[in-house]
């Protein structure tokens, strides 16, 4: 199985929370990908952090070990889903989530996210949540 990691999963990994590192090892990092939108969100988070240098360095190290998927191949699907959801009167509020979701669909990847409700309205999406909160 191949996975697209949502930004929140990457943040949990970088912070050493919820044993995401163990799950990644179990699933195989070679089977995991991220969207370039996730890179954008991680960079914003690092820039907005208290220790920018440390945060950017952690992101740099993480990015060296994972394949980044561009959004270009998912733009048509993005437009289709955005129009479909708008016509249903249920617009996707977060454009970045929509782009990440359709990237998973178009690349036939399982989306790994803690925010399952943000994506479950997308046609054809497969979702897993690796986070167990106690």
Where are these regions (language model features)?
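A general structural signal for well-ordered alpha-helical segments in protein cores
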Residues: 39, 52, 56, 75-78, ...
């Amino acid at each position: 199985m191949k996975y697209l990691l949502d930004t929140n999963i990457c943040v949990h990994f970088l912070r050493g929370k919820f044993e995401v590192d163990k799950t990644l090892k179990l699933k195989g990092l070679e089977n995991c990908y991220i969207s370039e939108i996730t890179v954008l969100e991680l960079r914003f988070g690092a820039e907005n952090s208290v220790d920018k240098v440390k945060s950017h360095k952690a992101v740099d190290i993480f990015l060296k070990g994972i394949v980044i998927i561009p959004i270009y191949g998912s733009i048509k699907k993005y437009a289709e889903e955005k129009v479909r959801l708008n016509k249903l009167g249920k617009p996707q509020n977060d454009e970045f989530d929509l782009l990440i979701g359709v990237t998973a669909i178009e690349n036939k990847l399982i989306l790994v996210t803690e925010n399952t409700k943000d994506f479950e309205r997308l046609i054809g999406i497969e979702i897993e949540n690796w986070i167990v909160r106690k």
